[in-house]
């Protein structure tokens, strides 16, 4: 792994030198400078499972939730072969902003309609997966948190891209097979293997329709070590560990999405169902968003919702039947399990305005009202003991997005 990182760094450093000698090398950059404020200081609002610091508990105003800087190198030595390297610096699992590789692949065009990629790519799980971190390309400050919070976003392996025109209808197939891993907040590391993703996209004029399916097998050593403690309580504890641990558990995500953008206005929506036999639990999420372009100013609205889709039953250790010296531990473990399997049900209403004040820069202001369902802490993190379940959270975000 260290050798791979060294090679990537050498490629990154050598890029400018190659650019002086070869016009086939293109360098692009993008970024976001953002601030977000939360009125609830008992939990943090974050945008990914990677982030350990957010707005609310850590700081009422946070500059690390949305801020990032990315650089992409594209090398085209021939009309069939290309290489892409994208590095993004943003907040990582330890709360520090540092660069990591988002894309790193070679692509070969077998035919004008069929290409193969080998290397690291972003999974095509959702409508905006491929460019969700290029905030300038999106009308909102960030994608709905209810929808885009997933354990693994990248895959190291092989991708197949196919497109075909049928008159005015364009069809695109994007398939991925590989593996990967992800460091997450709380000193957790999730390993994904046998990752498979298939996305089908249909475009007709201003309309886009997309169907996608992805699955992977997830393992987390840290999570499994925690649930191994439950096995001290015999068959009851082993049943809990087997149900909720993360030991080669299959995660499946089904998504349907679409958009319509005739120019002056736009609307988009997505629906997804996530299934996994683990503490994550099953869930259903959806959103609808739209806006109207008034010259350089674009006001927009978004409504998003996520809810648990399991059977609602939860197992607990019977502390009363445990030996006296283990009764206290059983109660503590029940508390941990209750927190880990707590519903994430929430609804968010978003209002915002985008102002394109330059050809390559935009200012956005956005207000989010998050309404948590009863007994839910939503997708918030760093939830404190005195956090009120079912409470609401109000966010105010100010960002500047740019590309060059």
Region spans (language model):
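Sec-dependent signal peptide recognition
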Residues: 2-8
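Signature for the C-terminal beta-barrel architecture of outer-membrane proteins
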Residues: 110-113, 151-295
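Outer-membrane beta-barrel pore domains
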Residues: 40-42, 58, 107, 228-404
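A solvent-exposed, charged loop/short amphipathic helix patch at secondary-structure junctions
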Residues: 47-55, 385
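Short, linear, compositionally biased motifs with a strong N-terminal bias
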Residues: 10-12
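N-terminal signal peptide c-region/cleavage motif recognized by signal peptidases
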Residues: 14-16
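Outer membrane beta-barrel
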Residues: 21-38, 58-182, 192-196, 200-211, ...
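Outer-membrane beta-barrel proteins
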Residues: 38-42, 94-97, 125-130, 171, ...
């Amino acid at each position: 792994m260290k050798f791979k990182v060294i090679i990537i760094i050498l490629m990154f450093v050598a890029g400018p030198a190659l650019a002086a000698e070869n016009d086939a090398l293109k360098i692009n950059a993008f970024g976001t400078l953002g601030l977000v404020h939360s009125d609830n200081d008992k939990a943090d609002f974050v945008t990914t499972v990677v982030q350990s610091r957010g707005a609310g508990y850590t700081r009422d105003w946070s500059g690390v939730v949305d801020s990032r800087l990315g650089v992409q190198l594209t090398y085209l030595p021939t009309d069939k072969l290309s290489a892409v390297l994208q590095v993004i610096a943003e907040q990582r699992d330890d709360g520090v902003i540092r660069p990591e590789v988002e894309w790193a692949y070679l692509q070969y065009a077998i035919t004008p309609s069929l290409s193969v990629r080998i290397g690291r790519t972003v999974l095509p799980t959702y409508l905006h997966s491929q460019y969700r971190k290029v905030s300038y390309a999106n009308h909102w400050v960030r994608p709905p948190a209810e929808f885009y919070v997933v354990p693994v976003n990248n895959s190291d392996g092989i991708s197949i891209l196919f497109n075909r025109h049928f008159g005015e209808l364009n069809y695109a197939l994007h398939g991925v097979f590989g593996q990967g891993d992800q460091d997450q907040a709380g000193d957790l590391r999730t390993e994904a293997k046998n990752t498979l993703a298939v996305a089908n996209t249909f475009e007709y004029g201003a309309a886009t329709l997309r169907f996608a399916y992805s699955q992977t097998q997830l393992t987390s050593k840290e999570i499994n070590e925690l649930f191994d403690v439950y096995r001290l309580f015999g068959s009851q504890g082993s049943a809990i560990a087997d149900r909720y641990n993360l030991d080669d558990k299959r995660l499946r995500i089904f998504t349907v999405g679409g958009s319509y953008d005739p120019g002056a206005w736009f609307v988009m929506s997505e629906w997804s169902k996530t299934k996994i036999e683990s503490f994550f639990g099953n869930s259903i999420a959806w959103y609808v968003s739209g806006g109207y372009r008034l010259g350089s100013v674009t006001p927009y609205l978004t409504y998003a919702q996520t809810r648990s889709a399991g059977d609602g039953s939860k197992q607990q250790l019977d502390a009363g039947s445990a030996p006296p010296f283990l009764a206290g531990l059983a109660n503590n473990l029940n508390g941990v399990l209750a927190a880990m399997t707590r519903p994430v049900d929430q609804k968010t209403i978003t209002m915002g305005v985008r102002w394109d004040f330059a050809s390559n820069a935009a200012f956005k202001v956005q207000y989010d009202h998050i309404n948590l369902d009863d007994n839910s802490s939503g997708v918030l993190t760093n939830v404190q003991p005195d956090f009120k379940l079912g409470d609401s959270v109000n966010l105010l975000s100010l960002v500047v997005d740019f590309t060059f």
